[in-house]
Amino acid sequence: MKKKNRIAVIGGGVSGMTAAVTAAEQGADVLLLEQKEMTGKKILVTGNGRCNYTNRVQTPQCYRSDDPEFPWKVMQKFPAEKILELFQEMGIYPKDRNGYIYPNSDQASSVAETLQEELDK
């Protein structure tokens, strides 16, 4: 019998919740740690309450890192199109405003609720 991976994800924002959902879908036993009273709380204020969850224009200059190659490596492995695809699979459809991607509902709560539903599965 294959041993289940055990993973701890620190932070219950968009990235943490998405990482936890993805790991669980891959069969991992996931523990999501969040210091706030609920996961997804910070999502509700991102993008002025609309949740700008990714950007079409991603360049290494937009990110800070001691390793100048690190942002480029991450962007190559997980580009905006892959994020859009992942979110659409969960039922979050995009609205593009000059390269800034929001949920079609324009409500950050729809992103938080959908991610929480995915976590609860």
Role assignments for model-derived ranges:
Residues L44-K77, E81:
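N-terminal glycine-rich dinucleotide-binding loop that anchors FAD/FMN and/or NAD(P) in oxidoreductases
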Residues R6-I7, E69-K73, Y102:
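Short, contiguous strand/loop micro-motifs
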